[in-house]
């Protein structure tokens, strides 16, 4: 009976929602893409509450700089990761308990994955690539965090998702791609030198310089547009599905577009990052700092 509890609760909520909809107490509102493809409810407010100041603003500014929902979501992801890192590093023991064993398993998996491509160079890039992977993973699935946002417009009280997938914003993916670009160019400078890097652009013959140069510019473009396109496309598709059937049909698809696709795209981004870094390193031996 306990296992049936969540199912019964979900059925009761669905039936109650439809009943309120039929009575005109609440209504469904198709969310704009900038707020995520989730169900939003709107409730008509009494005139006395039309000017009530709701605290949750989707976009504002600080000292002239815009603070959008993407920025807020990115801050949330960074704060969440800092809290997880601090919690996971407390009370470490020689014989690990379940919490410590869980994080050591993740560390071991990433260490083996990086070692296959980077060899001994993984010692230098593990921190960056590991942090990048965890940031991408949480950013891609942040829409699963049940944090509501509230707003009031024209006498209508709206409940919408407070967070948006940061990687569905091109500004985020381009910024991450530029960090990766700096990493593999710095690796090339480290192993081949400044002039060696530019000499490589003329190989195997000088006529290849335009193509090689275009290839270097294509790397950050590739990883940024790939990640942005996949995450934003998922939002568009789910938004269309919510437009057609706002309650039951789109819900299971979040497991694919938000969870499965988010995990896969995180792996794709870091794998391409490691491939680019490995291509810059080549056969050079690991150099200690």
Curated annotation (Swiss-Prot):
GO BP terms: proton motive force-driven plasma membrane ATP synthesis; sodium ion transport
Pfam families (alphabetical): ATP-synt_A
Gene Ontology MF: a single term: proton-transporting ATP synthase activity, rotational mechanism
GO CC field: plasma membrane; proton-transporting ATP synthase complex
Signal peptide (from-to): none
NCBIfam families: ATP_synt_6_or_A (TIGR01131)
Note: The ATPase of P.modestum is of special interest because it uses sodium ions instead of protons as the physiological coupling ion.
Function of the protein: Key component of the proton channel; it plays a direct role in the translocation of protons across the membrane.
Protein name (Swiss-Prot/TrEMBL): ATP synthase subunit a, sodium ion specific
């Amino acid at each position: 009976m306990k296992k049936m509890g969540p199912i019964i609760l979900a059925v009761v909520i669905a039936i109650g929602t439809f009943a309120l909809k039929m009575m005109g107490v609440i209504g469904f509102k198709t969310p704009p893409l900038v707020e995520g493809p989730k169900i939003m409810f709107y409730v008509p407010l009494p005139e006395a509450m039309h000017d009530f100041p709701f605290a949750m603003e989707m976009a504002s500014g600080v000292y002239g700089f815009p603070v959008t929902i993407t920025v807020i979501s990115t801050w949330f992801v960074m704060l969440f990761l800092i809290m997880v890192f601090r919690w996971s590093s407390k009370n470490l023991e020689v014989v690990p308990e379940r919490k410590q064993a869980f994080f050591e398993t993740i560390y071991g998996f990433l260490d083996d994955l990086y070692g296959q491509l980077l060899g001994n160079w993984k010692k230098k890039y593990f921190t960056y690539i590991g942090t990048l992977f965890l940031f991408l993973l949480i950013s891609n699935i942040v829409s699963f965090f049940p944090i509501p946002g509230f707003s009031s417009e024209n006498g209508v009280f709206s409940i919408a998702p407070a967070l948006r997938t940061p990687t569905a914003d091109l500004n985020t993916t381009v910024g991450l791609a530029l960090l990766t670009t700096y990493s593999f160019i710095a690796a090339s400078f480290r192993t081949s030198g400044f002039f060696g890097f530019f000499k490589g652009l003329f190989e195997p013959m000088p006529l290849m310089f335009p193509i090689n140069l275009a290839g270097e510019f294509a790397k950050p473009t590739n990883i940024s547009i790939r990640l942005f396109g996949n995450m934003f496309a998922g939002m568009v598709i789910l938004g269309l599905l919510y437009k057609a059937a706002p309650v039951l049909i789109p819900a299971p698809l979040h497991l694919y577009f938000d969870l499965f696709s988010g995990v896969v795209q995180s792996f794709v981004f870091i794998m391409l990052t490691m491939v680019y870094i490995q291509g810059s390193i080549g056969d050079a031996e690991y150099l200690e700092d």
